[in-house]
Amino acid sequence: MAPGRLGCSAVSGQRPPTDSDRVPFTAGHWPDRGREKKSDKTADQQWSAVLLWPDDFYDFKKAASYTPSFKYPILNKEPARALFVKLYQVRGTFIMQTKTTFRKLLSMVMAIAIPVALQNLLSTTGSMVDTIMLGRLGETEVGAVGLCAQFTNLMFSGYWGFIGGGMMFISQYWGEHNEEGICRSYGIMLSFLAAVAAVFTYLAVAMPEWVMSVYTSSEAMQKVGVEYLHTVGWAYPFMVLAVGMSTLLRSIERVKIPLVGGIVAVVTNCTCNYILIFGKLGFPALGARGAAYGTILANIANVLVIVILAKACHVPFLLEIRRHFGKSRGLVREFLAKSYPIILNEVLIGVGNMMINIVLGHQADSAIAATAVFRTLEGLIIAFFSGFSSAATVLVGKEVGAGNHEEAFSRAYRIIYLCQAMTLIGCLAVLSIHAPLLHAMGLSGDSYRTCLGMFMIYTVIGTIRMGNWSMNDTYRSAGDSAFGSLLEITFMFAMVQPAIHIANDLFHAPFLLVFALCYVDEPIRYIIMQTHMYSRKWIKPVSDAGRATIGAFREKYGIRVKERKAS
């Protein structure tokens, strides 16, 4: 008899399965591939494969009760035999209970992750090109624009809470096929985004001197930063609108349109920056202010492309303005109830990061320049990773909204570990080409060595950090917006902030040690987040279909969750 995989032959006292033993396929859950194929394997070999391959859809109860006979005699003796049989049966049960094979899930993830990652990578690449162009003007310009980017990131923290709430509701309503819920959720999200954009536009345009004085004490950097920030503030409304539209399109799995818009935006940004920074084609050389004008034009182009393509492709929901802003007080209350932990998290973490950046911004000029370049490289990693995080949000939220909670959990942990693996690959890829990248961005001497040290530290901790990030996004998409948010806020202000300020202000520690302490909480949070993931308590649907099945799911796993009743 031919041995099976892992040295196990399919010899036993039980009969091999026949076609009558196959479990019927359920529409929407079981793939059709392999149903019509005639296998070349013998019946015994097929039975062995039941415990090994998720593509063989036999009754998992038969698989779990099957007792294999091992090729090697030592494995057939007790207690080794009992242990291996138990492990084999558990493995067979696990495989047969898995509704979606990893290959199928991977294809679904890639369909969302690759366009989103490409869009984000293009955007980050555009920022790198900006940095390279500004690097030809000097380290002062690079550092000043980098500090302005931190103010933009604070705006990102301010509106990302509403983005997270919008993705939660839209993805779950998408799984439920609730068109009215999708439109109203998008309208609520867009209204709050507009309010945040208005506040930051005012601060950037009317109070740029105050903003720059918060971030740095260097007068040279303040002068360049004020000029840049006063202009780039007008890009914020278009930037936020593009993000809102892209969020809706991603949540309904129409990811190619934002990708095309991102490509046009990057090309526009790079072209305009080259012309306006250096004064080409008869235009005056505007320096850092030219980069700000390029950002404005790029974001306008992004919005126009998304609107035109959505209209041409007859994309639902995006342009149905009347349906966006109807009466929906109950939904607004529920939206805010689910979103406020995310909003609180993003605002407080944004403030915490600003406090960290203030510490990092009051270092030597070489360290400030190194930090600006590092943030650009970090953006590459986050852009690459965020595509997979977006896939987790959409694919898990969709199944929770449809009431398929077992499938949601199965997708969640697979995608989370995939996110971590891709993050590690991305970090190693950037680290392998660090020399030409750092030299191209105008770093040399101390600033070069500092930036390299920062990225080496980040390579070690980045995989853990992105694991925490992807788990938090997954919990939010499933309706649990509080756990990860509370955990992150607590560790930021109870551990990270004291550690950084004590090291910097009291002990005057080296810059790289202070930087490393920015991530001191990540390993501890990872352990806590993993425990919460396997508890399954984070599945809290907002859709009617999801709520209809959550009771049986919780009863099955003995889960007790206190939730406020929807109004």
Predicted regions and their residues:
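Short runs within selected transmembrane alpha-helices of multi-pass transporters and secretion channels
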Residues: 163, 167, 232-251, 258-269, ...
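Short alpha-helical transmembrane segments in multi-pass integral membrane proteins
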Residues: 61, 66-116, 170-237, 283-340, ...
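Polybasic, lysine-rich low-complexity intrinsically disordered segments
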Residues: 37-42, 57, 62
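Transmembrane helical elements of multi-pass membrane transporters/channels
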Residues: 111-130, 231, 265, 298-302, ...
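Helix-terminus/linker motif at the lipid-water interface of multi-pass membrane proteins
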Residues: 121, 125-143, 212-219, 277-286, ...
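Small-residue-rich hydrophobic transmembrane alpha-helices
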Residues: 142-202, 239-253, 257-258, 357, ...
